[in-house]
Amino acid sequence: MYKNLTIASLLGIVAVVLGAFGAHALKSKLTPEAMQSFETAVRYQFIHVLLLLFVNTFKEFSLKQKNAISFFLIGGIILFSGSIYVIHLLKVPAKSIWFVTPLGGVLLIIGWSMLFFQFSKKVIKKNS
């Protein structure tokens, strides 16, 4: 649990730094479309960092459940947001890593789906 919270905290720091960097240093260097893409990456990172913090402090989930959900969320953040950062900060052609961003999105969807499944099990159990 603390490992996941530590990773979430680090990813939160990175999101703040890259958000500020994007707002101040990149605005004049990126096209409006590229800036929008970069801001989307930062926003998704923030949202999923908050979800990671929630999942790992929710007392009704087992450590195994927390770790499983966190695995997909952390992987999704790194692949989804990370690939967008690589494209815009390192000028790597999107064509060369086109598959990474959607793969990250799929991992995020799996993480959300696992969260949904865990809550659904609790609702069904409570209503039985």
Regions found by a protein language model. Name each.
Residues 1-128:
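Polytopic transmembrane helical bundles with strong interfacial aromatic enrichment
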